[in-house]
């Protein structure tokens, strides 16, 4: 696909100009970090974050506990301090023209504090939040032994995480009982999605987002469309990478275990020239040679990098990349068992899987199933059968350049360019015993997309109470697919289409009463321009159909909170409407069969719209050792897009079905969570979510429940440190019964799958070499209870073991 360098040229112009911007005299922030007994804490990591999120830099304390940030501009910041064996602490600080000093005393027994940037697009402490946000940091990921962002999110409140098989298999995230594509995925605050995905989401790459150089993951539950645009109807997941700065640090890690799993990871970060230059980089390799059925091979190579320069304390240029290359062996989709007689219409069928031994015999024999040529027993569905020559090759690239300048103490601006590319190829040969048969020759389907985004943003501080953010965003997305096979006279077909959009956004954040009162109001207007599709090979579809651009999107968002300092109680409320433009595939998607296109899309589709409300209370007790949270949520999907049967007068003659507009459903429920730190060596976290998620109208089986949603979700994470060097973490997730979208003998039947409990145990031992170097040895048992369960008919791994070591400096 062609690349448009215009935005790059624009930012490079500022790069040439930046060194000549008049520099203010450099400021500094210094101080000392101590423990509760006023003893110095050496090796503590301190991160300074600008309130407008334009700067994030890190230093470490010296042997006497002292620290110093140099070459920083005057202004408002949050300072985050963390050290092994202590609770993470966040302090607000205003750096004045003559510098500032801030001493920090760390607590050994308290709930970790965090700096959050996803809720408002600016840096906030936990006490300042007016929305429901969960943070999982790098230390928690290490204690749990997680290498996948998908598994990291499994214990977050309100989230239902599914993976269709073993490591590297397709995954999904559902927030508060909504659909998986209702969650926006960000990398360092930049939207990450695939324009060639059916819904234009990041679903196809969720399982390829691995822990490479990750600092933390932030999860916003509730509408975020006014800040982050399309696909943020239900929530936002923001993967924040290491921002570099400070002394050189890094890690080298190797692990291996069950399922033929091997993983290697290296990362480094630091700064130079007194932190005028800051950088981070990471490389990860995941290989799975066996998988669940012995032939589920997976390979993933991931790269992350950041390089930036502070020309002056007020002028910064940075660039970042995140890329992945992957291979995944695919199985057949689960299907109903031949010979199973469907019950009367409207009946929910309890899913019963075919015996695993019989499934292996069927796969070895390689003969298509009939009602009489296998031993069905009492099974009514067949889990994913092995398909020896079905595979997917994929890759993505996300790269960004950002230029930021602070004009004075009240105004700054930033310009950024972001490019996201994605390419997926599916190849399926004649082997296997699929329910719909196998191709005579290897079929090839390639789906590629690229998205270019240019953003200009201004932040204005109006007095000490208001921060106004306003900006413009231009986005161009292109989607193309290609279909062929390896026959002697291969057919070929392709489709290409482009869409552009212009968005204007604004947000005002108000803080009053010594920052105890927080009010945020946001608005976004987005306009779309659609080109005509380009078909080649086979007769084109959508002839005579008017190609109208989607209507303008107007979204608003408001949140408010008040913190009662005397009782450490916070009340909060959040309301927002969401919007999702029809994807390019939903409007023009087609499949190529027998030398012709079969249309699935509808160029006339209306966008999806929603309204969401939530409110809650956060209570801190026992001098910060206990934090309780309760949230009620309500989301109504006013208009949705789904697959169905078009009317007889459908202009595109979609005889096999297609995408249509429907009235949406709703989800309402509660989220409860508790964090407890009874002592410096023990941490507990538990959450319970009840989500009553219904469609507007029952399906053919008479079921109202949203496909894939579990009404009850419980999570638990318990960490115990022993003698400072040994730690053990137990994490558990339990979900109730659910009914996914799943093939059935007739459209009048709906399968119900049993809920499950997944428990993991990770233990580690850290061996210090000196003050800055250490070795860590660890082992993890996943699904430690060895439960047999299925995700939408795909068999999950039983009990597995992984062990490894890491060297940290």
Could you tell me what each predicted segment is?
Residues 133, 150-194, 206:
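Extracytoplasmic beta-strand/coil segments of soluble accessory domains associated
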Residues 441-447, 451-457, 497-505, 600-606, ...:
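Outer membrane beta-barrel strand-and-loop segments of large Gram-negative receptors
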Residues 258-287, 292-367, 389-415, 462, ...:
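Transmembrane beta-barrel wall of Gram-negative outer-membrane proteins
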Residues 172, 191-221, 239-240, 334, ...:
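Short acidic/polar hinge/loop motifs at secondary-structure boundaries
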Residues 34-39, 45-51, 82-86, 96-142, ...:
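Short, acidic, small-residue-rich periplasmic hinge/interaction motif at the N-terminus
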Residues 269, 275, 410-428, 561-563, ...:
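Membrane-embedded beta-barrel scaffold of Gram-negative outer-membrane proteins
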Residues 269, 308-312, 508, 561-564, ...:
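Conserved C-terminal beta-signal and adjacent last beta-strands/turns
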Residues 464, 468, 475, 511-522, ...:
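Gram-negative outer-membrane beta-barrel transporters
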């Amino acid at each position: 696909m062609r690349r448009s360098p215009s935005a790059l040229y624009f930012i490079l112009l500022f790069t040439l100009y930046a060194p000549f911007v008049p520099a203010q005299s450099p400021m500094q922030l210094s101080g000392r970090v101590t423990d509760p007994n006023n003893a110095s804490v050496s090796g503590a990591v301190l991160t300074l974050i600008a309130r407008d999120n334009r700067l994030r830099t890190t230093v470490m304390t010296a042997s006497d506990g002292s620290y110093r940030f140099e070459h920083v501009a005057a202004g408002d910041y949050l300072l985050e301090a963390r050290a092994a064996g202590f609770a993470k602490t966040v302090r607000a600080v205003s750096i004045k023209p003559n510098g500032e000093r801030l001493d920090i005393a760390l607590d050994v027994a308290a709930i970790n504090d965090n700096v959050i940037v996803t809720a408002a697009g600016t840096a906030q402490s936990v006490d300042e939040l007016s929305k429901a946000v969960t943070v999982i940091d790098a230390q928690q990921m290490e204690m749990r032994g997680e290498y996948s962002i998908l598994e990291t999110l499994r214990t977050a409140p309100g989230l239902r995480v599914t993976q269709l098989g073993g490591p590297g298999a397709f995954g999904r995230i559902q927030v508060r009982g909504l659909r998986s594509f209702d969650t926006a995925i960000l990398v360092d605050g930049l939207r990450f999605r695939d324009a060639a995905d059916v819904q234009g989401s990041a679903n196809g790459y969720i399982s390829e987002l691995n822990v490479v150089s990750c600092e933390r993951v932030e999860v916003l539950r509730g509408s975020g469309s006014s800040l982050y645009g399309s696909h943020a109807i239900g929530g936002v997941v923001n993967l924040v990478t290491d921002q570099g700065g400070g002394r050189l640090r890094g890690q080298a890690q190797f692990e291996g275990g069950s399922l033929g799993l091997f993983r290697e990871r290296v990362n480094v970060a630091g700064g130079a020239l007194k932190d005028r230059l800051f950088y981070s980089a990471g490389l990860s390799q995941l290989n799975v040679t066996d998988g669940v059925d012995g032939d589920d091979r997976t390979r993933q190579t991931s790269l992350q990098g950041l390089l930036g320069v502070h020309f002056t304390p007020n002028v910064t240029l940075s660039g970042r990349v995140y890329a992945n290359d992957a291979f995944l062996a695919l199985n057949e989709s689960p299907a109903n068992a031949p010979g199973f007689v469907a019950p009367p219409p409207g009946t929910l069928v309890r899913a019963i899987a075919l015996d695993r031994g019989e499934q292996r015999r069927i796969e070895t024999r390689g003969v298509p199933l009939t009602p009489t040529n296998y031993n069905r027993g009492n099974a009514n569905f067949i889990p994913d059968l092995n398909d020896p020559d079905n595979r997917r090759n994929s890759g993505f690239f996300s790269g960004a350049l950002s230029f930021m300048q602070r004009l004075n103490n009240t105004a700054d601006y930033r310009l950024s360019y972001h490019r996201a590319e994605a390419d997926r190829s599916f190849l399926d040969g004649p082997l296997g015993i699929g329910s719909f048969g196998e191709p005579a020759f290897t079929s090839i389907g390639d789906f590629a997309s690229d998205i270019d985004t240019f953003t200009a943003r201004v932040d204005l501080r109006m007095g000490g109470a208001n921060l106004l953010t306003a900006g413009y965003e231009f986005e161009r997305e292109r989607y193309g697919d290609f279909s062929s096979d390896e026959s002697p006279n291969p057919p070929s077909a392709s489709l290409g289409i482009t869409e552009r959009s212009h968005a204007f956004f604004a947000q005002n954040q108000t803080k009053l009463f010594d920052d105890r009162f927080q009010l945020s109001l946001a608005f976004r207007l987005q306009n779309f321009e659609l080109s005509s599709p380009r078909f080649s090979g086979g007769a084109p579809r959508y002839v005579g159909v008017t190609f109208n651009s989607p209507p303008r999107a107007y979204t608003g968002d408001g949140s408010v909170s008040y913190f009662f300092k005397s009782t450490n109680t916070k009340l909060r409320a959040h309301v927002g409407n969401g919007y999702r433009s029809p994807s390019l595939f939903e409007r023009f998607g087609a499949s190529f069969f027998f030398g012709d296109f079969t249309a699935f899309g509808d160029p006339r589709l209306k966008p999806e719209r929603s309204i969401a409300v939530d409110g809650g209370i956060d209570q801190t007790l026992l001098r910060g050792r206990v934090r309780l949270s309760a949230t009620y949520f309500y989301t109504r999907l006013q208009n949705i897009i789904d697959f169905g049967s078009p009317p007889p007068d459908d202009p595109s003659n979609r005889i096999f079905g297609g995408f249509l507009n429907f009235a949406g459903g709703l989800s309402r429920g509660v989220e409860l969570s508790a964090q407890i730190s009874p002592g410096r060596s023990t941490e507990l976290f538990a959450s319970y979510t009840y989500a009553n998620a219904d469609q507007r109208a029952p399906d053919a089986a008479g079921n109202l429940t949203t496909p894939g949603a579990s009404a009850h979700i419980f999570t638990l994470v318990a960490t115990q440190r022993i003698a400072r060097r040994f730690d053990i973490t137990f994490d558990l997730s339990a979900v109730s019964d659910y009914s996914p979208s799943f093939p059935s003998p007739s459209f009048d039947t709906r399968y119900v799958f049993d809920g499950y409990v997944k428990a993991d145990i990770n233990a580690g031992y850290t061996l210090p070499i000196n003050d800055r170097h250490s070795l860590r040895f660890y082992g993890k048992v996943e699904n430690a209870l060895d439960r047999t369960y299925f995700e939408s008919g795909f068999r999950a791994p039983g009990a597995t073991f992984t062990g490894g070591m890491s060297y940290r400096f």
